[in-house]
């Protein structure tokens, strides 16, 4: 993937950049890892490994030309303990390092949550695994809000720390936040998504703090516009600003309260003041009630569509068949 990305960057750089003045970047997911115990050097190092094995796996080669040293050390040692002659982590030639390094005009960041990290040794006998290679354990604070997805906890302060990490680690590149949002479970049909508005408010506020820290953030995009297919979770999780009724063949969309709230944040380029933000929240909740009524009526609409599209044609077909049978019966009697 890294070499393919570099190929695209160099192709654009050589053939089109001078005319189009465009940019080529890459979007990477990265969650923040916080040490469980700040007095423990092992926990501090484990938290660093968590980030390097996550974001650094791809970002470090692009900015520095090679995999993070901690990845090379840990995976190399685990590979040797498992009887392998070489590390399971691929190596780059000098030419490849040079070719990959610097192929990023901007960095896209997808961020959703944070974990507490502590040191945990995994014997080589556990077998090769990305998770056991890291020698760490992920923990969560039970007090963190958990809106829907079992992996996604709302931890806004981790966002600011991750953005500052990118600034320090990679020379303060231009950043576009390409994914940030929160989900609810498929069974939820509530359009007044107060928890999503709170998530956006707190996470965007932490991003603004990072900008004041000097992080070169240029843009922000919520994840996502519509409820849709979510990787391993399929349609069982909803991240959308718009509710999609997957039961209906027409897949109608209904705006959640967060639509108006997010719209006001973006059009104002942030939060004018606390009172105004609270007013946005109140208006968004007020406007979602009518949408909820539409959504509540939708099962009836779907039922009527089913009657029109399935039941009526079936009854007509049966009537035609019965008429044909009756006609055949009359003809036989006549003969």
Residue ranges with predicted function:
Residues 1-297, 313-316:
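Active-site region of glycoside hydrolase catalytic domains
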Residues 297-308:
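Extracellular Ser/Thr-rich, low-complexity/disordered mucin-like segments
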Residues 302, 315-318:
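N-terminal compositionally biased, intrinsically disordered segments and leader/signal-like regions
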Residues 306-312, 330:
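N-terminal Sec-pathway targeting helices
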Residues 318-334:
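Single-pass type I membrane-protein transmembrane alpha-helix
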């Amino acid at each position: 993937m890294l070499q393919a990305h570099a190929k695209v960057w160099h192709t654009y750089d050589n053939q089109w950049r001078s005319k189009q003045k465009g940019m080529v970047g890459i979007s990477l997911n990265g969650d923040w890892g916080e040490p469980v115990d700040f007095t423990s050097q092992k926990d501090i190092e484990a938290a660093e490994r968590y980030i390097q094995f996550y974001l650094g796996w791809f970002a470090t080669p692009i900015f520095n030309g090679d995999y993070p040293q901690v990845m090379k050390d840990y995976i190399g040692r685990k590979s040797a303990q498992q009887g392998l002659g070489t590390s399971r982590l691929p190596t780059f030639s000098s030419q490849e390092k040079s070719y990959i390094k610097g192929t990023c005009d901007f960095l896209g960041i997808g961020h959703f949550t944070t974990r507490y990290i502590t040191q945990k040794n995994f014997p080589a006998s556990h077998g090769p695994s990305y998770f056991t290679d890291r020698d760490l354990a992920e923990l969560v604070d039970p007090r963190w809000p958990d809106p829907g997805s079992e992996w996604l906890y709302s931890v806004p302060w981790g966002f600011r720390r991750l953005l500052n990490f990118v600034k320090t680690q990679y020379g303060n590149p231009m950043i576009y936040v390409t994914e940030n949002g929160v989900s609810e479970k498929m069974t939820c049909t509530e359009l007044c998504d107060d928890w999503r508005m709170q998530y956006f408010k707190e996470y965007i506020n932490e991003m603004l703090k990072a900008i004041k820290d000097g992080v070169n953030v240029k843009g922000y995009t919520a994840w996502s516009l519509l409820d849709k297919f979510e990787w391993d979770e399929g349609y069982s999780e909803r991240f959308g600003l718009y509710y999609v009724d997957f039961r209906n063949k027409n897949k109608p969309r209904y705006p959640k309260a967060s639509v108006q709230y997010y719209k006001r944040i973006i059009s104002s380029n942030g939060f004018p003041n606390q009172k105004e933000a609270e007013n946005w929240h109140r208006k968004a909740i007020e406007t979602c009630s009518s949408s909820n009524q539409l959504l509540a009526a939708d099962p009836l609409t779907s039922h009527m569509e089913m009657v029109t599209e399935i039941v009526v044609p079936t009854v007509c077909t049966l009537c035609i068949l019965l008429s044909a049978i009756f006609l055949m019966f009359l003809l036989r009697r006549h003969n």
